[in-house]
Amino acid sequence: MLYLNQKPEYNKYDIGDYTYSKVGPTIFSWNDETKLKIGKFCSLAEEVVFILGGEHRADWITTYPFNALFDEGAHITGHPSSKGDIVVGNDVWIGYQSCILSGVTIGNGA
């Protein structure tokens, strides 16, 4: 068992005291704008994943990342995108293999 806010790899995230996991979550981040905040006394099961952005633009004519794969598309901005920060309240249990996407808020005690 490890307290996440005591592990250097999680220092850039806002993680409350006594939040723990057996192995720690996987966190994917495509920029420093989308934040992850996890409250105190949370329990994270194994293989939990937080995805901070990196989402395809379903509102565009294509979800293909032309700007990332072709020099001709380098001028296209807004892809990948984020729906906002991830906020997890206090005393929350996140179960095995859960995947939490950007823009999600989980309330206290969930």
Regions found by a protein language model. Name each.
Residues I106-A110:
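Short, intrinsically disordered, charge-balanced linker/junction segments flanking boundaries
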Residues M1-D14:
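Class I SAM-dependent methyltransferase Rossmann-like catalytic core
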Residues Y3, Y20-V104:
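Flexible, glycine/small-residue-enriched loop-and-beta-strand segment within the central core
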